């Protein structure tokens, strides 16, 4: 899988993404249902993620997890646990959680998918993707994430926060700020596919 690793900045200690999701996008017009149509060219990880999330092609999990392990993990220190980012869309099977478990299996590292608790957005508020700037996103996310004390033993752990898409970084920042309040997490690194 061809990747172009990029460092990402935020409230985490280290952060990287594998590649851009979409390399190019050409507007084709409006279809018969009134939807805008695009001819998208995705990166290899971007196409794998698209197939996983929108075509339910679960065979993409192993190659994506293997690519994260091979390319991104050597850039981080020792990882003690993996925390998938909370999903923004409810699905019967959450792609980021499944990816975290596939990566955890490859690394022999525990996954804590219930550690981050996301409060629902206030009724009538716009979706995060419809907000226009980082300040609006930060305001919409303020106070929405709390920590479930899921680590049952003593100690301090280095966590890898895993997400599929990285845009402005507002959500990952809000989650990392919440993680900083949890005494059992020493530091948090961030990884995303795109």
Labelled PLM ranges:
Residues 1-16, 173-194:
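PRPP-dependent phosphoribosyltransferase catalytic core
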Residues 96-112:
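Glycine-rich phosphate-binding loop and adjoining helix at the ATP-binding site
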Residues 70, 101, 105, 177-181:
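Short, well-ordered alpha-helices that flank and scaffold nucleotide-derived cofactor binding pockets
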Residues 83-86, 111-125:
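A short, structured active-site edge motif that brings together acidic residues
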Residues 1-78, 89, 120-151, 155:
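Active-site-facing substrate-recognition patch
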Residues 86-95:
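Glycine-rich phosphate-binding loops at beta-strand->alpha-helix junctions
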Residues 165-175:
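Acidic, divalent-metal-coordinating active-site segment for phosphoryl/phosphodiester hydrolysis
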Residues 142-150, 157-161, 174-182, 189-190:
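Long C-terminal interaction/binding lobes of large macromolecular proteins
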């Amino acid at each position: 899988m061809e990747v172009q690793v990029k460092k990402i900045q935020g409230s985490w200690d280290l952060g990287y993404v594998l590649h851009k999701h979409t390399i190019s996008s050409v507007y084709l017009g409006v279809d018969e249902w009134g939807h805008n149509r695009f001819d998208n060219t995705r990166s290899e990880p971007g196409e794998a993620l698209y197939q996983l999330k929108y075509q339910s092609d679960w065979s993409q999990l192993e190659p994506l997890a293997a690519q994260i392990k091979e390319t991104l993990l050597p850039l981080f220190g020792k990882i003690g646990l993996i925390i998938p980012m909370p999903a923004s869309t409810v699905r019967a099977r959450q792609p980021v959680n499944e990816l975290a478990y596939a990566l955890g299996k490859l690394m022999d590292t525990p996954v804590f998918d219930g550690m981050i608790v996301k409060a629902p957005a206030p009724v009538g508020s716009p979706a995060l993707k419809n907000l226009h700037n980082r300040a609006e996103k930060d305001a919409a996310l303020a106070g929405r994430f709390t920590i479930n004390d899921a680590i049952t033993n003593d100690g301090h752990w280095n966590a890898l926060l895993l997400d599929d898409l990285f845009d402005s970084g507002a959500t990952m920042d809000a989650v990392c700020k919440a993680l900083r309040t949890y005494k059992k997490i020493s530091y948090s690194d961030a990884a995303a596919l795109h």
